[in-house]
Amino acid sequence: MKKIIIIITCFIGLSGAFAQQRGMFHNPVIEADVPDPSMIRVGNYYYLVSTTMHLMPGCPVMRSKDLVHWETISYVFQRLTDLPRYDLKEGTVYGRGQWASSLRYHDGRFYVWFSPNDEPHRGYIYTAEDPAGEWTLLSRPPHHHDASLF
């Protein structure tokens, strides 16, 4: 009986020596304003879009392989041009921003839906084959707060 207790005690004592060790991890805080993130994984990369409060360029697209090291690879739009107030003519929407973008991937294409805080209260849906490339306006759906693509 003594041998069994000694063997069990040794086994329990040594079990921690073979446990997986925790690696060193640094908090991936970056010098950026990234509110309302929407993130997906496609292949070996994670992609993230977020709100921009001063519109242009707008809706940054970021990419990471490990969720720690991020790079901004593009913007969904460089300018919004369908209303004069986006160019500070006939009023302004400066500081109202576009918010809560929704990022999705389907059948080889990336999609982003967001709504700016302006009238006539219409959203924007953009699409791209390459998220680091040029994004194309696909649709102007009705405005929805924090909308999400399925």
Where do the language-model regions lie?
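Carbohydrate-active catalytic/glycan-binding domains of CAZyme proteins
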Residues: 18-150
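Sec-dependent N-terminal signal peptides
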Residues: 4-13
